[in-house]
Regions:
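Conserved small/polar residues in nucleotide/adenosyl-binding loops
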Residues: 163
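Active-site histidine-anchored catalytic micro-motif
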Residues: 93-160
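Conserved beta-strand scaffold positions in the cores of enzyme catalytic domains, especially
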Residues: 26, 86, 116-118
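N-terminal glycine-rich phosphate/adenylate-binding segment common to multiple enzyme folds
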Residues: 68-97, 104
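N-terminal glycine-rich anion-binding loop in soluble enzyme alpha/beta folds
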Residues: 5-70
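A short helix-to-beta-strand connector/capping loop
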Residues: 2-3, 21-24, 111-115
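Short beta-strand segments
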Residues: 8, 88-90, 119-120
């Protein structure tokens, strides 16, 4: 069974400690609030973020483009002999999922012995994070990439998210 890594987006709102402990790779999806841009590396404090939203400010996001996704995938594949499972931000909320599928196809042409499976979470925030959490549990229990991808595809429809 080939080793694989899990990639997800910063939209999962998973704690940084969890991400680091489980060696997850994060695709940074920047957001802008009141004219200032924030990233995974430079976030706005959570309390401040929600205080501003309660006061009427609305954040806007940027989707990942195929080049950014390809850069992330290639950096992983150059350093490791692994496949990639990417649990992506909802296709209903962003074009990032489609960008990641395009990037995965392009990168797999350069690395034909590797696989990149991109799963549309149909979720965001901790709904998406919950799917990542379960994928980590399944991986740690010895499930392979395909088994986890099937589980995600079958179970993502059982989430109920309120925005």
């Amino acid at each position: 069974m080939k080793e694989f890594v899990i990639v997800t987006d910063t939209t999962t709102d998973l704690p940084r400690e969890y991400v680091e402990k489980h060696h997850l790779y994060m695709m940074s999806l920047p957001y802008t609030l009141e004219g200032t841009s924030y990233t995974w590396e430079n976030p706005m404090p959570v309390k401040e973020f929600y205080d501003k939203m309660r006061a009427g400010s609305l954040p806007t996001t940027s989707q990942a483009n195929p080049e950014e996704a390809a850069t992330l995938y290639e950096s992983i594949l150059k350093e490791n002999d692994v496949d990639i499972l990417h649990i992506a931000f909802s296709s209903g909320l962003s074009g990032s999922f489609n960008s990641c599928r395009i990037a995965a196809a392009d990168v797999c042409e350069k690395y034909p012995d590797r696989r990149i499976v991109v799963v549309d979470s149909l979720a965001a925030t901790l709904g998406q994070g919950l799917l990542v959490y379960k994928a980590v549990q399944l991986k740690e229990a010895g499930k392979n990439l395909d088994e986890i991808a099937v589980w995600l595809e079958e179970n993502k429809y059982h989430l109920c998210l309120l925005y």
